[in-house]
A protein has these predicted regions:
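Peripheral terminal and inter-domain segments
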Residues: 177-287
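Conserved ankyrin/ankyrin-like repeat signature
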Residues: 69, 106-107, 131, 163-167
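Ankyrin-repeat boundary/"N-cap" motif
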Residues: 49-61, 82-98, 117-124, 145-159
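C-terminal segment of N-terminal export signals and the immediately downstream linker at the start
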Residues: 24-61, 66
Length: 287
């Protein structure tokens, strides 16, 4: 979740677009390269014609907070307003989704003006009460669907402030529009679980489990704040919610299970996403 890091940290993970002067270069053969006649050639990657992942990630990142950069990226590559990024475990987010759960009306309205498909979540944040009612009338129960990072529909309306007050009042009358409380997590369980879990020899084959939750304090996005942070080395933090018996689900992926059990080798972690994805054992403390 992006509130978990500073703007500087976010931008460290993002990269800049190709120079605009390079955009008019023609591709002559897939996997080939234009002769360097003007000293400004580009390679065609294996992912072409899909959008460059580094640009998608940056666009979704800056759509939380930086309107100017959003405009620069969309001016250079207009299709980025419809991009989507997976922060982990299938927690997909679009630029409009990012702006919506942050309550960033200016960015949301700009993205919509550039062709980003509107959503129920953007309508809730923008205070579009009749649109929200129409969707719920056509699809009863859809208020239970969560947005990026498991943020509820009602929370999106809360982030819209006074302009979305009518939507907030309406959603409060509907069952399931807000998040359910997670299972309590005892302090002794937290202490028992924290540490670094290893599932291979590579430097990125480690997961840090931490309990620094100050980033979620006083935030309207979550009615019930996450209880732990799960971070694979080199990736963004995934907030965890407790289901009971030391079993959790990561934000944006309620069907995934992250379980902790005591074993002969120490504390074990397993990740199940329809099938067992990985098992890891916690590093032993140096004596």
């Amino acid at each position: 979740m992006l509130n978990a890091v500073s703007r500087r940290t976010l931008l460290k993970f993002a990269s800049t677009v190709f120079p605009v002067s390079a955009m008019d270069l023609k591709v002559f053969a897939f996997g080939a390269r234009r002769p360097r006649t003007e000293g400004n050639a580009i390679m065609v990657t294996d992912t072409f014609p899909a959008q460059p992942p580094e640009l998608v990630r940056e666009m979704v990142t800056v759509a939380h907070f930086d309107l100017q950069r959003v405009k620069e990226l969309s001016d250079a590559r207009p299709s980025l307003v419809k991009a989507a990024w997976d922060w982990g475990f299938g927690d997909w987010e679009t630029p409009l989704g990012a702006a919506s759960h942050m309550g960033n009306r200016a960015i949301a309205e700009y993205l919509l003006s550039q062709g980003a498909p509107p959503s129920l979540f953007s309508a809730a944040m923008l205070g579009q009460l009749e649109a929200v009612k129409a969707v719920l009338a056509g699809q009863p129960g859809v208020q239970r669907v969560r947005g990026p990072h498991s943020i509820s529909l009602l929370a999106h309306a809360r982030m819209g402030g006074e302009a979305a007050h009518g939507v907030s009042e309406y959603l409060q009358s509907l069952e399931g529009a807000d998040a359910d409380p997670p299972s309590p997590l005892r302090e002794e369980d937290i202490r028992a679980l924290l540490g670094t879990y290893v599932f291979g020899v590579g430097v990125t084959q480690q997961v840090d489990l931490t309990a620094d939750l100050q980033m979620y304090a006083n935030k309207k996005m979550y009615t019930y704040a996450p209880q732990l942070n799960w971070t694979r080395k080199g990736t963004m933090t995934r907030p965890l919610f407790h289901l009971g018996n030391r079993t959790f689900y990561p934000a944006g992926a309620p069907s995934v299970r992250i379980c902790f059990t005591e074993g002969s080798d120490g504390m074990l972690m397993s990740v199940d996403d329809g099938e067992l994805v990985l098992s890891a054992v916690r590093k032993r403390s140096k004596s």
